[in-house]
Amino acid sequence: MPRLHDHFWSCSCAHSARRRGPPRASAAGLAAKVGEMINVSVSGPSLLAAHGAPDADPAPRGRSAAMSGPEPGSPYPNTWHHRLLQRSLVLFSVGVVLALVLNLLQIQRNVTLFPEEVIATIFSSAWWVPPCCGTAAAVVGLLYPCIDSHLGEPHKFKREWASVMRCIAVFVGINHASAKLDFANNVQLSLTLAALSLGLWWTFDRSRSGLGLGITIAFLATLITQFLVYNGVYQYTSPDFLYIRSWLPCIFFSGGVTVGNIGRQLAMGVPEKPHSD
């Protein structure tokens, strides 16, 4: 019996010792973990302050950036205005060159009336005519893409400079035909040039906006030209006055379509102007 009692006593002591051992170890580990958490919580703000807390709160940064808008030093608006200025200068130059070339073709037929010393030079036009034509070309060339984007009417053909150059060649050819060819009467001349001008529009444009703007440009430009003639600012030779009125609207129509195609080609690949809400 004593031996059995000793056996039970030793087993119970060992069991109690084993039960008391792990709680002490777990308590020590828990205390160590709590100490580490306290150290991290104390040193965390200082680390965030040292690194500037880049990812602490990204939402306020996004809101502040959205409210502030584009930065003043952003090159995008300047690039847009720079490209607009480039397009305007190119269209102005095209208008000046076309005015000089077409006026030279008409002088060969003695349609325009200038002093002999002016006609003897290649710049055989009144000084204000080429700048006015250049300004009109810049306005028309910038207006065509704006109307297209406003109406949402895409162009029916693939834009390429080869097509634009062919359009310019046809336009110059129409002017050359009006200066060189002889017709039986002015009605025949008007119908022929009208057919050629509509053919130019159908071949290189085919847009309703192009047709409407071409007709509007032809009407307004013819009206302004006749106003200048009646007030003595610009003169035509008397025998050809009816001849001038017969071909002038067709020339202005085809010129508007041609300059519009140039403006559309220049506007390709240009990003839209940024809007701020």
From Swiss-Prot:
Protein family according to the UniProt entry: Belongs to the INSIG family.
Record's note on what induces expression: By insulin. Expressed at high levels when nuclear SREBP levels are high as a result of sterol deprivation.
BP terms from Gene Ontology: cellular response to insulin stimulus; cellular response to sterol; cholesterol biosynthetic process; cholesterol homeostasis; cranial suture morphogenesis; inner ear morphogenesis; middle ear morphogenesis; negative regulation of cargo loading into COPII-coated vesicle
Feature type site, description Required for the recognition of 25-hydroxycholesterol: F171
Keyword set, alphabetical order: Cholesterol metabolism, Endoplasmic reticulum, Isopeptide bond, Lipid metabolism, Lipid-binding, Membrane, Phosphoprotein, Steroid metabolism, Sterol metabolism, Transmembrane, Transmembrane helix, Ubl conjugation
Tissue: Expressed in all tissues tested with highest expression in the liver.
Transmembrane segments: 85-107, 127-144, 160-182, 186-204, 210-231, 246-263
Subunit (UniProt): Interacts with SCAP; interaction is direct and only takes place in the presence of sterols; it prevents interaction between SCAP and the coat protein complex II (COPII). Associates with the SCAP-SREBP complex (composed of SCAP and SREBF1/SREBP1 or SREBF2/SREBP2); association is mediated via its interaction with SCAP and only takes place in the presence of sterols. Interaction with SCAP is mutually exclusive with PAQR3.
Protein's job: Oxysterol-binding protein that mediates feedback control of cholesterol synthesis by controlling both endoplasmic reticulum to Golgi transport of SCAP and degradation of HMGCR. Acts as a negative regulator of cholesterol biosynthesis by mediating the retention of the SCAP-SREBP complex in the endoplasmic reticulum, thereby blocking the processing of sterol regulatory element-binding proteins (SREBPs) SREBF1/SREBP1 and SREBF2/SREBP2. Binds oxysterol, including 25-hydroxycholesterol, regulating interaction with SCAP and retention of the SCAP-SREBP complex in the endoplasmic reticulum.
Cross-link (Glycyl lysine isopeptide (Lys-Gly) (interchain with G-Cter in ubiquitin)): K156, K158
One GO term describing the cellular component: SREBP-SCAP-Insig complex
Localization per Swiss-Prot or TrEMBL: Endoplasmic reticulum membrane
Modification sites for Phosphoserine: S207
Ranges of the Cytoplasmic topological domain: 1-84, 145-159, 205-209, 264-277
Domain comment, as recorded: The KxHxx motif mediates association with the coatomer complex.
Biased composition (Low complexity): 51-66
Lumenal side: 108-126, 183-185, 232-245
Reported modifications of this chain: Phosphorylation at Ser-207 by PCK1 reduces binding to oxysterol, disrupting the interaction between INSIG1 and SCAP, thereby promoting nuclear translocation of SREBP proteins (SREBF1/SREBP1 or SREBF2/SREBP2) and subsequent transcription of downstream lipogenesis-related genes. Ubiquitinated by AMFR/gp78 in response to sterol deprivation, leading to its degradation: when the SCAP-SREBP complex becomes dissociated from INSIG1, INSIG1 is then ubiquitinated and degraded in proteasomes. Although ubiquitination is required for rapid INSIG1 degradation, it is not required for release of the SCAP-SREBP complex. Ubiquitinated by RNF139.
Motif (KxHxx): 271-277
Organism: Homo sapiens (Human)
Topological relation to the membrane, as annotated: Multi-pass membrane protein
Protein known as: Insulin-induced gene 1 protein
UniProt-annotated stretches for the region Disordered: 51-73
InterPro entries referenced in this protein's UniProt entry, alphabetically: INSIG_fam
One annotated GO molecular function: oxysterol binding
